[in-house]
Amino acid sequence: MICKEEKTDTNDSVIYDANCYLCPNNKRANGIKNPDYKDVFVFDNDFAALNNLTNQNIYDNDLLQAKTESGICRVVCFSPDHSMSLANMDVVNISKVVSVWKTQYEELSELPNINY
């Protein structure tokens, strides 16, 4: 049997991608420009699955019960380095990400219409 190993062309080593909506200084899908962030960056998701409406609709009959939920969907960019993943980060930078997660949880849980 003859086997040939082929390498696929991936962007794993690309530090900056001009076409990436998450990279620093790039425009996102909604036209907002990201800042030139140097660390963990958080923003509200441009196309969130939930919105922050306070009115609630309830549907209730014998078979089905449903109600609307409000919320905020946030995006956390771990690093300005396009190729960086949590698995490749050092402990200091992983700690920064975890700290941001904690802060986001605390901030969002203070909002009256968030049920996290």
Could you describe each region identified by the protein language model?
Residues 1-116:
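Active-site microenvironments that recognize anionic phosphate/pyrophosphate groups
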